């Protein structure tokens, strides 16, 4: 047992370093190519001339597509090995190291150039890859899946400052590939990754800053659960739209470089309307939580952003769908909050409350992981008083979504990419 705890600690540190390396690479490329040192792609887009804002995502997609296409052509005769941690956990626990690194580099290119795709996909992949490389050298083969799972959970903890949610991400989404009795090392790796991330960042701040002062009574619980019902309907719709977008790109029969470039060009065109479509949506979520926008502004940004997400994901841009899903959920929740605000006092407080509820419930509706989704929002914001209401709403959203569509967004995304 002591040996496993020691290995879990080392994997947590390795995962945090992998996440930090990807984050610093992003910041370096943003500074070199976009003259941006704020860490916000939205700020970078606002500082660019219209024509640069238009073509930058397309150029990033083209570069990433060429990289992926070139690697595929060079390695056509090689036997296939997983380049995704979920696939590795479901097979023999081995990665194609070269292909995984190329996929992560391609993800870095599309993320830095403004595509509306999440960076957490590459971060978790690199963390799991680091764990796999360590495990293959120093642990017996029968433990490899455990350490890949620990690396993936630690990667999520480092990316989202949410170690418990990262651990439950493994337990809920990958249920059946890892026994619950093995979660001890997974939790240790996730917590160590978070602590290492805090040391590297020089602070232990929450991922999102929220000022929520509303008292929770029966009325608030009704609003939270009703948000879960709406999210349970919207989750399958979002996944259907992603599938439809992906199939539309496939029907064009473009080579990967041109397909990703087209997805980037669509993002660039949308960014001429609003630069908030750039990136994974993190900075927009934070600004909305600090100052909820008006009804019409939420709707306008929401439509543009979801079109950008569909273009990026549908074109095959390598990356995650986690943070974009959080943005969509926030927008749905705040939209409902503004509707409730027509009749109830404290419109901004209601918008923030239901925005957080929307983030949790849409995440639950798309991942079919209600406990993880609830803890994720609480850990990212520190608003643990919402836990009982969010848990009920997330279960409602997950059950309704699973009834309407069996696949989760991660199973769908893995199948398409």
From Swiss-Prot:
Subcellular localization: Cell inner membrane
Biological processes annotated in GO = response to acidic pH
- For the Periplasmic compartment, the record's topological domain ranges are 26-53, 167-172, 243-257, 309-315, 372-379
Q: Does the keyword ATP-binding apply?
A: no
List the stretches on the Cytoplasmic face of the membrane: 1-4, 75-145, 196-221, 279-287, 337-348, 401-417
Q: Per its UniProt record, what Pfam families does this chain match?
A: Voltage_CLC
InterPro entries in the cross-refs: Cl-channel_core, Cl-channel_volt-gated_ClcB, ClC, ClC-type_chloride_channel
Output the superkingdom of the source species. Answer: Bacteria
Q: Where are the transmembrane segments?
A: 5-25, 54-74, 146-166, 173-195, 222-242, 258-278, 288-308, 316-336, 349-371, 380-400
How does the protein associate with the membrane? Multi-pass membrane protein
Query: What GO molecular-function term can you cite, just one?
Result: voltage-gated chloride channel activity
The UniProt entry's GO CC annotations, sorted and at most eight, read: chloride channel complex; plasma membrane
Keywords linked to the UniProt accession: Cell inner membrane, Cell membrane, Chloride, Chloride channel, Ion channel, Ion transport, Membrane, Transmembrane, Transmembrane helix, Transport, Voltage-gated channel
Which family, according to UniProt? Belongs to the chloride channel (TC 2.A.49) family. ClcB subfamily.
Protein role: Probably acts as an electrical shunt for an outwardly-directed proton pump that is linked to amino acid decarboxylation, as part of the extreme acid resistance (XAR) response.
Q: What is this protein called?
A: Voltage-gated ClC-type chloride channel ClcB
Task: Please give the organism.
Answer: Salmonella typhimurium (strain LT2 / SGSC1412 / ATCC 700720)
Quick one: which gene encodes this?
A: clcB
């Amino acid at each position: 047992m002591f040996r496993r705890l020691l290995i879990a600690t080392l994997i947590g540190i390795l995962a945090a370093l992998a996440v930090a390396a990807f984050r610093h690479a992003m910041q370096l490329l943003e500074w070199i190519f976009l003259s941006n040192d704020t860490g916000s792609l939205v700020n970078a887009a606002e500082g660019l001339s219209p024509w640069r804002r238009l073509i930058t995502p397309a150029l990033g997609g083209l570069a990433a597509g060429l990289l992926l296409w070139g690697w595929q052509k060079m390695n056509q005769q090689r036997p296939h090995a997983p380049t995704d941690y979920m696939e590795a956990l479901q097979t023999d626990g081995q990665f194609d190291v070269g292909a995984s690194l190329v996929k992560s580099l391609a993800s870095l290119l599309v993320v830095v150039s403004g595509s509306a795709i999440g960076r957490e996909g590459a971060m978790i992949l690199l963390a799991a890859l680091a764990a796999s490389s360590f495990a293959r050298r120093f642990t017996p083969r029968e433990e490899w899946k455990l350490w890949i799972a620990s690396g993936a959970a630690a990667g999520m903890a480092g990316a989202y400052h949410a170690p418990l949610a990262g651990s439950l991400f493994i337990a809920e989404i990958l249920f059946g590939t890892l026994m619950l009795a093995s979660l001890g090392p997974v939790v240790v790796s996730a917590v160590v990754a978070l602590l290492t991330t805090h040391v590297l960042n020089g602070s232990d701040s929450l991922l999102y800053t929220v000022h929520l002062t509303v008292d929770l009574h029966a009325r608030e619980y009704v609003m939270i659960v009703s948000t879960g019902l709406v999210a349970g309907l919207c989750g399958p719709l979002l996944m259907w739209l992603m599938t439809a977008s992906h199939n539309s790109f496939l029907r064009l029969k473009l080579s990967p470089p041109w397909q990703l470039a087209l997805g980037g060009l669509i993002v660039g065109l949308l960014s001429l309307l609003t630069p908030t479509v750039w990136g994974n949506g993190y900075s927009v979520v934070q600004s909305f939580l600090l100052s909820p926008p008006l009804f019409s502004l939420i709707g306008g940004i929401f439509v543009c952003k979801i079109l950008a997400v569909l273009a990026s994901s549908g074109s095959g841009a390598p990356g995650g769908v986690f943070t974009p899903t959080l943005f969509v959920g926030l927008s749905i929740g705040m939209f409902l909050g503004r509707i409730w605000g027509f009749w109830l006092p404290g419109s901004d407080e209601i918008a923030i409350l239901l925005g957080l509820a929307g983030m949790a419930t849409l995440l639950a509706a798309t991942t079919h992981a209600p406990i993880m989704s609830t803890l994720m929002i609480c850990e990212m914001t520190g608003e643990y008083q919402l836990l009982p209401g969010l848990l009920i709403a997330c279960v409602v959203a997950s059950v309704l979504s699973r009834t309407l569509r069996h696949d989760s967004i991660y199973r769908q995304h893995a199948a398409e990419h």
